[in-house]
């Protein structure tokens, strides 16, 4: 992993990664939809980690906020965590990767650390019930962003994550 602050690009399957990434990586700020901050207790806890909260209905404005605030957080020494699918997906069925995180990387020159996991197998989305088992987390090599366009960075990180996901168990045994 890079020594300097980086942008973590990861698939999003459950609440598990939002909790456990805090134990794996240095101080982080998450990109999230603004209305998550309005949830009593949960949202207040999220706010303590200096997230980048966006209004997803205003895409151009959201991208401007992400780049501006992302640069600030990186300058403060915080790592950014971005789930480019934009929402939780089912194991074995990753969603379309949006390029916001790659755009921040391209404009700041910060490295991207791709991360793949299968947390949704044991912590299904929209379910209070959790299942026992071992969640696999694979941290990829840093993708340098200097002199690269966002599209290339996005393709590299998405390709790496999708390749890993094909090798991880997508259902409980």
Question: Where is each model-derived feature located?
Answer:
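Catalytic core of membrane glycerolipid acyltransferases/transacylases, capturing the structured
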Residues: 3-59
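N-terminal start-of-chain detector that recognizes signal peptides
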Residues: 1-4, 24-26, 52-54, 84-85, ...
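A short acidic, often aromatic-flanked loop/helix-cap motif at beta-alpha or helix-coil junctions
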Residues: 1-3, 38, 59-62, 143-149
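Non-catalytic C-terminal accessory region of glycerolipid acyltransferases
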Residues: 63-173
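Short low-complexity stretches enriched in small and charged residues
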Residues: 2-11, 36-39, 67-71, 91-98
